[in-house]
Amino acid sequence: MEQSSTKQTINIDDGDPPLIRKGMHSCMSQRSPETSVPKRARASSANSRWGRSTKFRKTYFPDATKEMWNDWHWQVSHRITTLAQISRFLTLTTEERQALEQTEGSFPFSVTPYYLSLIDPTDQASALRKSVVPSILELFTSPGESEDPLHEENTSPVPGIVHRYPDRALFLTTSFCSVYCRYCTRSRLVGGHTEPLETHWKNAIEYIRNTPAIRDVVISGGDPLTLSDEKIEWLLKEITSIKHVEMVRIGTKVPMVLPQRITANLLRILKRYKPIYLSVHCTHPDEITAESSKACNSLADAGVVMGSQTVLLKGVNDSVETLMELYHRLLKVRIKPYYLFQCDPITGSEHFRTTVDEGKELIRGLRGFTSGYAVPQYVIDTPGGGGKVPI
């Protein structure tokens, strides 16, 4: 989820710095008009997503009413977590079966029925499938990879707090996510058993209270929006009662994987403590559905300020067409494209990582071809705990 940054500048300039623009103009002049503008993702693929979850529910969960399907508790309690379960829904390859068997004891597999409804059941190469279904390549460790590449443990003064930057603190409130991303930076932490939340939280909040330099608290995990309304309100009340805390952010993927969680009561809670800033983890245009759009627009109506975080993933979203479609759709649901992250060197993630030069080329393919609001900042979270570096 979210890591606080040394730089918070959002580029809303439609152009490029003169030197970059000059080089880009030279490059563009060599292209025909037909190839100057990147081709948009086909509308048909986007339109096919609307209503998919309803068809999926009726096919695979015929006893589930519409009300049950739209209850986030039902979605969480019916998560698909085993090889036997996922085999009912997807035509698995031999490699996928082996991966599910061999990764079971290390990094859990979990996907909500809703999110599974967005995944192609037969195409192993489909983007969302790659992002959540284990790969046999996870079992191989490449040079430079580690379980804690950002050295968060080294900057954790008390359990649950990462205090890397002077005025910002990361508060890891839970190890639970409704859907586990296979490239997760905190795969070492998520999915396991933790100490009682009350003890964990009270010690963390006491640290924030006793550290006046902290003005910005990032609530993360796991996914904090999978907590109950009561726990979320308790956290927000405690944190916002600290006088030197000026800003509260929440890092989450819930609007994309569990949009049913954005209930009227949760919106009332968030509105009560506004402004709340939401860093929404978005991976691919296929996540922007009728359900996720409704959730995001409801959050915006409640006064929640939203920016996106996208991890650049080989074979998932590493094309100008895919990123442009994603960012245009995010803007339509009032999420500002904020960060595009180079994939962290987490153990077993080499198959997801592009080169930095490839990432820079993607940004060049966006800048100048679409509005500045649709161009995120490309950053590397430097290994060893050095913080974010814009590219």
Task: Locate each region found by the language model.
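Flexible, acidic/Gly-rich N-terminal and inter-domain linker regions that tether
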Residues: 2-163
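Short, charged beta->alpha transition segments
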Residues: 156-159, 169-172, 203-207
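Canonical Radical SAM [4Fe-4S] cluster-binding loop centered on the CxxxCxxC motif
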Residues: 163-198, 250
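Hydrophobic positions in the central parallel beta-sheet of the AAA+
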Residues: 171, 217-219
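Fold-independent oxyanion-binding glycine-rich loops
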Residues: 174-175, 187, 221-222, 253, ...
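Short acidic, glycine/serine/threonine-rich loops at helix termini
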Residues: 183-185, 230-231, 262, 391
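C-terminal accessory regions of radical SAM enzymes
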Residues: 361-391
